[in-house]
Amino acid sequence: TIPSIMMEEGSNESTRIHTPYSSVSAVGVQNLASKLQMALFPPNQSFFKMDVDRFTLMELTGGDPTKRAEVDEQLSHIERAVMSEMEKNAMRSPIFEALRHLIVTGNYLLHLGKEGVKGYSLDKYVVTRDPEGLVKQVIIKEEFHIETLPEDVLELTSFNVNDSGGEHKPVAIYTKFYREGKKWHTYQEVEDQMIPGTEGSYPVDEPPFMPLRWTAVAGEHYGRAHVESF
């Protein structure tokens, strides 16, 4: 399909990517991802519709049918606010990339952090699920250059300024999320040492990540790709 979607282990910017003999599969992946994005998130219109059931509507309006329009207007305000937040965080690009990866590899991770939405391919994270398919643990691997790391993190590494080319070697930082009780807990590590100040927690139903699967198979931690169906 598209070799750059899932590079071989050890690949870098100088690796020569194998070019398939035919572009049919690559075009198919691009077209399918585009059609899925248009269907799921159509431009200039809400991709979901908020509504209330009859009993809740009775409570909100007190049985007055003339107030239904007010309820609908408030719900539309919420819809527009969600759409505005989505556009502000520039989510369409990572969502399109997620769809491409799901088609080819069956797995992709979306993470909503302080800098917006980031996506991670299958070789950048691991996930553990229970037999019911619920996520128990996620670990994300990110690589940074030495000059971009803050001083407190740099002190935890084995970086030596006298090492030849050491300033160009990437440093791996791991972000771990694990479920414990009614909360998700998180912290970061570098070279097996916890980075101070990175600890945090989230409600169990509001984690800042989404480990997506194309086809979920019972008892398996990862999903199956669309291309495996052919």
Stretch-by-stretch model annotation:
Residues 1-169, 178-179:
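Extended, helix-rich architectural segments
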